[in-house]
Amino acid sequence: LHAAADPTGWWNLYRFRADSGGDAAGGRDGDAALPTAGDAEALRETSAAFGVPMWTLGVSTFAFLGDGRIATLVTEGGDPSLRLLDPETGDLVDPGLPYSSFRPASIRSDGDRVAFVGHRTDAPSAVVAWRPEADDGGPRRLRESTDDALDPAYVSEPESVTFPTGDAVGADDATAYGHYYPPHNPDAEAPADAAPPLLVRVHGGPTSRSEASLSSTVQFWTTRGVGVLAVNYRGSTGYGRAFREALKGEWGVRDVLDCVNAARYAADEGFADPDRLAISGGSAGGFAVLAALAFHDTFDAGASYYGVADLRALAAETHKFESRYLDGLVGPLPEAADVYEARSPVAHAEGVTAPLLLLQGGEDEVVPPAQAEAMIDALVANETPYAYVEFPEERHGFRDADNVARAHAAELAFYGAAFDFDPAGSVADLELLVGERPE
């Protein structure tokens, strides 16, 4: 049995050998005993991740070739690649495939070929087949995710960012990471003496991560003159167990501080206008948006997609799969009830002074619409400018292409209203409300 495990603090690949017979490890008489940690043999110990969070069915970060080698995902320094591991020698070879992300993490092999979904920073994602030993031109892109033509002249490619952070605004006793996509449009020219607005994008999970890849959402902003900084806050995966577990008991604190410090870093380094800083995210990322606006004054606007406003209500109402997730991220109830209250943005909505856009799926069972409704009530009571867009048939994460386009148009119109500019092109008819509920 082969599996990824992290006794050293990194998800490395291990081989588990089961003893024959006996029941010491749970096997029945006459059956092979189940392998235990004591049977584990590291194929290669290294400060890199060979595993990912098992959020969905079908996840497989490695596959066996006919000659015994293992094609495996390896995330080093936050950047994933597909490599070849010799389980007998521990040799790990990087063939230099031109892919920067592999999502979903589903590596498959028939012994001769390796199949995966590969993402690049300059081309759409694709289903890829690769013969490691064949001299036939390299990986074959069997099917791309879109048939639309892509003009590379408009593509903004990311730059890796490492910035100081910690348990306070402006602290520098910890480190977080991200990918910065600069504004890029060959048909437009920005003022030479002005830094661009910045959109900090916050991934969900929270134990997920942002990876460098071509994203139509990111390019939507960069072609319109907005820089995008996708943050990998403490708690993100791909940086080892210590970084991942830094969010245990600290959700709503350290992730938010890392986003705040990321924006401050961008402004201090001169690649973001300190007076035009926005933050956007969905699910756990939406929670970070609400908390960043409620507890900090760094951002000038925020867009929360199906974000968590009330932690205690989430613990009571979310779906079964994540029903105990908050025990580790925040603390067990009822013992940690005060912590839930202290970190819930809806309980501190008086701190939200920047304009806020809420986008919500009407059929969401993970973060139910009641979360957005409670936040609206608090914003109305405090006369905070906001806008609300509901998608009645959407669930957790918008799937319909027209709805995704509507959400982008609404967010663009929202920033136009918040930052007092007229967006180019087609935008949504959106009005900021103050002291009143949406019709």
Predicted regions and their residues:
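Multi-bladed beta-propeller domains
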Residues: D6, R17-G22, G26-V59, T75, ...
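Residue-level detector of Asp-centered blade-edge/turn motifs that repeat once per structural unit
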Residues: L57, F64-D67, R108-G111
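Conserved beta-strand position repeated once per blade in WD40 beta-propeller domains
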Residues: T61, P104-S106, A126
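Cap/lid segment of the alpha/beta-hydrolase catalytic domain
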Residues: S145-R276, G282, A309, A316-R324
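Active-site-proximal cap/loop segments of hydrolase catalytic domains
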Residues: S236-E439
